[in-house]
């Protein structure tokens, strides 16, 4: 069954109450979406900026091979973002957000413990899966605040780049202190925040 944009009447019922005494506050929904976006972007940023250095340091590969690994990671992310829309239409936003972020956690947690080719396979899988959540998160935010689509789009696209830049600076500072391998280990826990997607209303 095709999954269409939530009609305004349904959105109103989601944010004001579903008739059973459960009220979903707009600020609460946005807070959950921000947490999900934060965890997603921080993890992606950590891999984007440090994957090449990680595989060079841990597996002693040459820079060209390390760049191929980064290319594969970014390519999988682009594919995930592109296909995230149709996947969301098919399965629904809440399921896709939860499955994309929290579902990527087991693979992300394995990355620091496998060999070179295992790392490549896992980061490709994680990149594709976690990137597919972006369109679902954005559409959820737009439906919650249908009269402020421009502002919401700007905020979430701004978060995409802003959080990525801030995370890159933070992880760079942290890598100088504890090392790149430990940074990867710390970042691998970020997708666990996808569990917060279960707090989103089922009607959204």
Spans of model-derived segments:
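A late C-terminal transmembrane helix in Major Facilitator Superfamily
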Residues: 145-180, 184-187
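Multi-pass alpha-helical transporter architecture, strongest
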Residues: 1, 188-204
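Helix-to-loop junctions at the C-terminal end of transmembrane segments
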Residues: 80-92, 175-176
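Small-residue-rich packing faces within the transmembrane alpha-helices of Major Facilitator Superfamily
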Residues: 78, 102-106, 188-195
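Extracytoplasmic gate region of multi-pass secondary transporters
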Residues: 25-81
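Flexible cytoplasmic inter-helical loops of multi-pass small-molecule transporters
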Residues: 1-20
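C-terminal transmembrane helical hairpin of 12-TM major facilitator-type secondary transporters
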Residues: 86-137
